[in-house]
């Protein structure tokens, strides 16, 4: 996502501007590349170019208000109460928005003089990676801000989820940046502007999506970065973070600089960086991630993805944790087993699991509530969310810890979660929970300034102020009734922050209030399109008395809110740990629930090079097939890069529509599930950990870069052949199909040989080039698999069974018939096929040709070129023959001599 194209940033001459417009010009000068949401009463107004852009993007009216230097001022506005929806749309369109708030109410400004202007300031700059409001976020999805830095050839990717406080650092090789960013899926990525001159890195950033935000390179320099990171965390040294590298500090420094600019000095409650290396998680490049539809289907929707198929979580935090695990499968079998132990425990304790999931539904999103409170954007509902979450944790700690089964105690991962949730071990959390339970009322507003959220009886002085305020409100109701009776006009007494209390009548009914004698009582204040507003001396006096009582009550409520907010922020770390613990319990229980529903089993994950799946199924396809009422056909797959318990490379053949692509994806998905710590839909799975997963299944044109489908296919194939290791898993579908038949066959043949001989990885190679089946007899660790189909009464029936051995034909004409190709075309295709097959019959087999003979690489010289072998005696004798100068008799004698040499 990139910001909409716009002309160069416009500069403004503030000479002669009104005091309010001078404020706008000052804010615009500070943030020239952002739209300024300028608060004026109940609206956010936009002026000049901002008004034109916002009106076009949001579909709102653009008008004019006043003049500046003799020219009308373009203006557009959105109501304050609906601002989140408009902000969300602008951010999705790629705009940056600076929110300029009123820092005082008009009454306070008037105390400084009748002509004083309300103070305003930028309270935040909204960008895609810095969203925290529920209305702007997907509750079940992460929203990350990432940064990339490179130092001395080493790359680092840092990511922060501002809405939860999570921070991560990855130290990787430069060519692995794309895989890490694809796993993180950031909404916004910061990068030093000098790095964008690297075409490869720039293209990698583009492929990974999100807004790319260039930053001045100086911001990623080591010394400046270290200073900013220390300031961000409020520490004097970074030693406590475990010896961060220069690249990691540079990436974190970019994030710190961006947060300083966008959060207007407010420090978020961030956790210490979690550090990971390239060797800690399975590498999955963007193309593979897309083709396997891990968290999004090809159309961009969550529905139809692997995540959607297995997600049974009941909390927002649990949903985000599950998505993160699927995006970054682990490489350490011990860490994988720890996750699987937690899932297995809930599989074995079904009754407890069901009760736990029911209780979890009452937990709020504590992590995001805490972040908003820390940034000064939270409200009473966020305190209520903390209360509900801590109360839920307290219940779960007793429920799981007291499961009463001494023979099957909770595994280590669940024990750790329970400790984070046990109030007796977290004295501060216990105290905060007690305060919130007694202090918060039942109906909580979104904003602290709305009042009404402190429970009665908690603060006696607040109860007294409320009583006076509420008595005054009854007086207002009585005054309204009397004014209606005296005037004969159906009016209402209303209130807003600008006018205070006022009398409002519809425009059609207000005329008597302008006429004697009523005009002596009713003083005109404001005329709107459909209403007219007035005041009276009595109402103004009452307004002052109510305001004083209401102000006192609200001030006391806000003070109580600030006390609780400060207490919560001071306890940020244990609250974050408690939120993480709830998410872990939710994920483990949810995966157990899915495992039971799907008939999934616990995989065995080790450090071998094996891949042994028995009766495996594709979870997404199986769910779709079951919805249609059809059975799903499971299949086996056995690979072993060491060649001990299975083939290293399986050539997969079979008709179109027989299920080759599904079979390939199915086995890749099994690996992702297993290494993420999930059960797998199969009878059994033994998996040697996979370091990199590559998929070349389907491709499309990249017209913007002048790349055809075939070129894209070759680019992806090149990446696989240069990066796959013996511990990798590769799935390839129809390599070479986008070019001429023999070109494609030659490329497919050579790629298969390279995977077997050079990469030596586990690989599934689906193809319609049946000639590749002969590799089974020519290479040591190749097997053939075919997806079966049979003809029945002239129709083709797909069995979706993977069987040993190659397919005998592709049945392309029959598939064309099934697709609805006109019968005449099908008949003609059959006729042409018969002719081609009869003409190409030859006693010579394809694998007898030198091109397709199995390649055994010989010795290489110092330049890497093959060393030419010395000519044989037969070759030398053949080279000495003067064919043109020989008589028939001499030629016959030479032939006998050559034959004799061959026998020696």
Curated annotation (Swiss-Prot):
Pfam family, one: MutS_I
One GO BP: mismatch repair
One cellular component term from this protein's GO annotations in UniProt: cytosol
Taxonomic superkingdom: Bacteria
Gene3D superfamilies xrefs: 1.10.1420.10, 6.10.140.430, DNA repair protein MutS, domain I, MutS, connector domain, P-loop containing nucleotide triphosphate hydrolases
GO MF assignments: ATP binding; ATP-dependent DNA damage sensor activity; damaged DNA binding; mismatched DNA binding
CDD domains: ABC_MutS1 (cd03284)
ATP-binding as UniProt keyword: yes
Keywords: ATP-binding, DNA damage, DNA repair, DNA-binding, Nucleotide-binding
Residues binding ATP: 654-661
Keyword Ubl conjugation: no
Family of the protein in this entry: Belongs to the DNA mismatch repair MutS family.
Task performed by this protein: This protein is involved in the repair of mismatches in DNA. It is possible that it carries out the mismatch recognition step. This protein has a weak ATPase activity.
Name assigned to this protein: DNA mismatch repair protein MutS
Gene responsible for this protein: mutS
């Amino acid at each position: 996502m990139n910001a909409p194209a716009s002309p160069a940033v416009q500069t403004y001459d503030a000479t002669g501007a009104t005091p309010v417009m001078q404020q706008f010009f000052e804010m615009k000068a500070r943030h020239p590349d952002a739209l300024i949401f300028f608060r004026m009463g109940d609206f956010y107004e936009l002026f000049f170019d901002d008004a034109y852009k916002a009106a076009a993007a949001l579909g709102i009216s653009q008008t004019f208000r006043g003049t500046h230097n003799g020219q009308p001022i373009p203006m557009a506005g959105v109501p304050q109460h609906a601002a989140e929806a408009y902000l969300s749309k602008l951010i999705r369109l790629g705009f940056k928005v600076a929110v300029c708030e009123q820092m005082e109410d008009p009454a306070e400004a008037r105390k400084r003089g009748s002509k004083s202007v309300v103070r305003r300031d930028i309270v935040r700059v909204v960008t895609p990676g810095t969203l925290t409001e529920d209305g702007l976020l997907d509750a079940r999805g992460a929203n990350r801000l990432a940064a990339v830095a490179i130092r001395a050839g080493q790359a680092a990717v840092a990511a922060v989820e501002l809405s939860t406080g999570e921070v991560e650092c990855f130290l990787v090789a430069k060519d692995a940046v794309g895989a890490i960013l694809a796993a993180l899926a950031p909404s916004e990525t910061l990068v030093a502007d000098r790095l964008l001159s690297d075409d490869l890195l720039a293209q990698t950033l583009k492929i990974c999506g999100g807004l790319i935000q260039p930053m001045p390179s100086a911001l990623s320099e080591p010394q400046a970065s270290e200073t900013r990171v220390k300031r961000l965390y409020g520490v004097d040294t970074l030693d406590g973070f475990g010896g961060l590298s220069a690249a990691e500090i540079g990436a974190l420094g970019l994030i710190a600089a961006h947060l300083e600019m966008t959060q207007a000095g407010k420090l978020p409650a961030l956790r210490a960086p979690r550090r990971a290396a390239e060797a800690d998680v399975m590498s999955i490049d963007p193309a593979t991630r897309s083709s396997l539809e891990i968290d999004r289907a090809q159309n961009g929707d969550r529905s139809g993805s692997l995540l959607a198929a297995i997600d049974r979580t009941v909390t927002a935090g649990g949903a985000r944790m599950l998505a993160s695990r699927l995006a970054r499968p682990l490489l350490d079998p011990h860490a994988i087993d720890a996750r699987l132990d937690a899932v297995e425990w809930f599989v074995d304790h079904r009754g407890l699991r069901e009760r736990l999931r029911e209780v979890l539904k009452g937990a709020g999103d504590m992590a995001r509530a805490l972040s908003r409170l820390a940034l000064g954007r939270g409200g009473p509902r966020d305190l209520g969310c903390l209360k509900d979450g801590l109360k839920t944790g307290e219940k779960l700690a007793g429920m799981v810890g007291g499961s009463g089964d001494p023979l099957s105690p909770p595994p280590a991962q669940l024990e750790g979660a329970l400790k984070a949730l046990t109030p007796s071990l977290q004295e501060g959390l216990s105290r905060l929970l007690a305060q919130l339970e007694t202090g918060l009322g039942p109906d909580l507003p979104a904003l602290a300034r709305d009042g009404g959220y402190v429970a009665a009886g908690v603060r006696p002085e607040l109860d007294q102020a409320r009583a006076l305020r509420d008595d005054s409100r009854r007086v207002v109701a009585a005054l309204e009734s009397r004014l209606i009776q005296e005037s004969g006009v159906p009016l209402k007494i209303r209130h807003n922050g600008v006018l205070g209390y006022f009398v409002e009548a519809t425009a059609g009914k207000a005329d008597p209030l302008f006429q004697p004698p009523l005009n002596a009582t009713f003083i005109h204040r404001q005329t709107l399109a459909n209403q007219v507003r007035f005041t009276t001396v009595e109402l103004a006096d009452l307004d002052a008395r109510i305001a004083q009582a209401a102000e006192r009550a609200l001030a006391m409520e806000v003070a109580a809110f600030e006390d609780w907010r400060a207490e919560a922020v001071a306890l940020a770390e244990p609250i974050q740990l408690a939120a993480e613990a709830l998410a872990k319990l939710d994920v483990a229980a949810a995966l157990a629930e899915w495992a039971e529903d799907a008939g999934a089993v616990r995989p065995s994950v080790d450090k071998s090079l094996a891949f042994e799946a028995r009766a495996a199924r594709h979870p997404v396809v199986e769910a779709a097939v079951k919805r249609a009422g059809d059975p799903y056909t499971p299949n086996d797959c056995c690979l072993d890069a060491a060649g001990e318990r299975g083939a290293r490379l399986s050539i997969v053949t079979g008709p179109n529509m027989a299920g080759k692509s599904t079979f390939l994806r199915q086995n890749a998905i099994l690996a992702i599930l297993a290494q993420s710590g999930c059960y797998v839909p199969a009878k059994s799975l033994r998996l040697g950990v996979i370091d990199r997963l590559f998929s070349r299944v389907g491709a499309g044109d990249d017209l913007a870069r002048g790349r055809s489908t075939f070129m894209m296919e070759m680019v992806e194939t090149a990446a696989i052949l240069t990066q796959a290791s013996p511990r990798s898993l590769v799935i390839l579908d129809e390599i070479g199909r986008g070019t001429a038949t023999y070109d494609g066959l030659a490329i497919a043949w050579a790629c298969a040989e390279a995977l077997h001989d050079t990469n030596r990885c586990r690989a599934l190679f689906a193809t319609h080039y049946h000639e590749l089946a002969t590799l089974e007899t020519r290479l040591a660790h190749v097997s053939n698999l075919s997806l079966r189909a049979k003809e029945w009464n002239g129709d083709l029936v797909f069995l979706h069974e993977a069987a040993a051995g190659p397919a005998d034909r592709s049945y392309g004409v029959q598939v064309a018939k099934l697709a609805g190709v006109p019968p005449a075309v099908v008949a003609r295709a059959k006729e042409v096929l018969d002719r081609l097959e009869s003409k190409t019959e030859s006693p010579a087999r394809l694998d007898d040709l030198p091109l397709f003979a199995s390649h055994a690489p010989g010795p290489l010289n110092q330049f890497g070129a093959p060393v030419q072998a010395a000519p044989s005696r037969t070759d030398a004798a053949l080279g000495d023959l003067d064919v043109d100068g020989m008589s028939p008799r001499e030629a016959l004698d030479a032939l006998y001599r050559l034959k004799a040499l061959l026998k020696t």
